[in-house]
């Protein structure tokens, strides 16, 4: 038996909005420690990893490990029926083929039940190794979203470079080029406005902007985004989910075609 009660129901709605365009179908894994998801996008270029720890729920019951295959588009449609202030309860029976979403208004004068069929989804669980990153950038999430959106109007690839000068986002396209440089800034009134750069080694990597723009759909979840970069590894773009977990996106860097054509 699974029963999870989340007082901040709007959190779950925001989580779904941030992953449904990247991943169509995925397994939600429930264990005694939390509610998680790990899935690749359809082109196997990006990976999304979500964790909502059990202690973040008002009530959390998971008798045994359970994996629930869901179509994220359908799940999002159901969650859109919940008000932003509603309390959301997720229920499923062991071995059952449906999951129930219950939405309660804060005054408890309205309760809605939505039942959704589960799917059988074959998914490989990818081990994500803990790694040491050459450079880590923490910045306001709305600033990162704005940069990705602005650069998309010029080109389709962003080069992220971290040096002792700061972090530079650049692109080039048919109409010209764009460079945006952010310098470390920790002397701000609000901690969420700070730009913090931890650089062990300089890095410069290229990524597809359409994926970066997709990742920024998680902006409503967190005021801050953390971008971890290493020359040999996928970038990690992480947004915290309140005090209860995180959503992390992994994206492999683009290899420059010019390198392949050199003799």
Curated annotation (Swiss-Prot):
GO terms for molecular function: DNA binding; DNA polymerase processivity factor activity. Keywords: DNA replication, DNA-binding, Nucleus. One of its GO terms (cellular component) is cytoplasm. Its main location: nucleus. Gene3D superfamilies: 3.70.10.10. The keyword Protein biosynthesis does not apply. Pfam families: PCNA_C (PF02747), PCNA_N (PF00705). Residues 61-80 bind DNA. SUPFAM superfamilies: DNA clamp. It is found in: Nucleus. The keyword Protein biosynthesis does not apply. GO terms for biological process: DNA replication; regulation of cell cycle; regulation of DNA replication. Belongs to the PCNA family. PANTHER family: PROLIFERATING CELL NUCLEAR ANTIGEN. Homo- and heterotrimer. Interacts with POLH, ATXR5 and ATXR6. This protein is an auxiliary protein of DNA polymerase delta and is involved in the control of eukaryotic DNA replication by increasing the polymerase's processibility during elongation of the leading strand. This is Proliferating cellular nuclear antigen 1.
């Amino acid at each position: 038996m699974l029963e999870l009660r989340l007082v901040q129901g709007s959190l779950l709605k925001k989580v779904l909005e941030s992953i449904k365009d990247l991943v169509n179908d995925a397994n939600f894994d429930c264990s005694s420690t939390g509610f998680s998801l790990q899935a690749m996008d359809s082109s196997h270029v990006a990976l999304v990893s979500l964790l909502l720890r059990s202690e973040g729920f008002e009530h959390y019951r998971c008798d045994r490990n359970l994996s629930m295959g869901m179509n994220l588009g359908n799940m999002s449609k159901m969650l859109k029926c919940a008000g932003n202030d509603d309390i959301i309860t997720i229920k499923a029976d062991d071995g059952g083929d449906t999951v129930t979403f219950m939405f309660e208004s804060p005054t408890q004068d309205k309760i809605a039940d939505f039942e959704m069929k589960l799917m059988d989804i074959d998914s490989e669980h990818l081990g994500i190794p803990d790694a040491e990153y050459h450079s880590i950038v923490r910045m306001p999430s709305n600033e990162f979203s704005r940069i990705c959106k602005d650069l998309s109007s010029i080109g389709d690839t962003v080069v992220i470079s971290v040096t002792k000068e700061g972090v530079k986002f650049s692109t080039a396209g048919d109409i010209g080029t764009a460079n945006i440089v952010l310098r470390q800034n920790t002397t701000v009134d609000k901690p969420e406005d700070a730009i913090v750069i931890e650089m062990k080694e300089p890095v410069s990597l290229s990524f597809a902007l359409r994926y970066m723009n997709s990742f920024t759909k998680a902006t409503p979840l967190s005021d801050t985004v953390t971008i971890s970069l290493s020359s040999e590894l996928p970038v990690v773009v992480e947004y915290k989910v309140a005090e209860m977990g995180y959503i992390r996106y992994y994206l492999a860097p683009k290899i420059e075609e010019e390198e392949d054509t050199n003799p």
